[in-house]
């Protein structure tokens, strides 16, 4: 018997709207959109005087539509077995089996890390109990994260490992099965970026202190004006708002002029760098 595996990323976007739903929370960490479409894997088996063709279609973010001959509508997975009357030719082929896994069938998502002899990472999607005549069949799709040593030409190609009329096992090695963390993309890549990030944090903190100082000054002036006016009113004196405003402005200007020296004095007390002139204590 001669087995030939013909594997293709097939047929693009063919009229479907669902397939393996890439929007479910279990797949949020992955990039299945990058392999969106209908993929296929074919096995040819010599069965003289005929040839048996078993083709499985896998819809990624895309339902396998009726445009693929004989596939049930709204299928995530579809398997078609046909008999070629002429070897390597599907002309006048006779379809003998059709298996469909409906998109509404309940799925299980099983992430794995450091699995097997090759320490593989990825995720497995499991289908349980699809109706096929009087039988119930299962399917297991294994998506393996591609490593840096894998060649691009070997990626995104599905391989059929098992189909015994009870269970389907298919795998694919793809970058789409590698966990992508958006937070990591925002992290600085070098010390320069870290320095820039720290500068931004410092600037934000400085503006915060300036804002609080400004608020306290406004509150102080408001209390001063209202308190002064109330004091004049309580003494029975007429309130001269122009004189009061002029006095407030003069005091405010004096406060601003004395503020730098006041701040400098506070800093010197904290840092211990007060200027004691050219003399030192003995």
Swiss-Prot record:
Membrane protein topology class: Single-pass type I membrane protein; Single-pass membrane protein
Membrane-crossing residue ranges in chain numbering: 207-227
Superkingdom field: Eukaryota
Keyword terms: Autophagy, Cytoplasmic vesicle, Disulfide bond, Glycoprotein, Golgi apparatus, Membrane, Mitochondrion, Protein transport, Signal, Transmembrane, Transmembrane helix, Transport
GO annotation (BP), single: protein transport
Cytoplasmic side: 228-282
Side of membrane Lumenal, spans: 20-206
Compartments, record wording: Cytoplasmic vesicle membrane; Golgi apparatus membrane; Mitochondrion membrane; Preautophagosomal structure membrane
Cystine connections: 22-61, 71-78, 145-178
Residues bearing carbohydrate: 53
Function comment: Effector of VPS34 phosphatidylinositol 3-phosphate kinase signaling. Regulates the cytoplasm to vacuole transport (Cvt) vesicle formation. Plays a role in ATG protein retrieval from the pre-autophagosomal structure (PAS) and is especially required for autophagy-dependent cycling of ATG9.
Protein name per UniProt: Autophagy-related protein 27
Lineage: Eukaryota, Fungi, Dikarya, Ascomycota, Saccharomycotina
Originating gene: ATG27
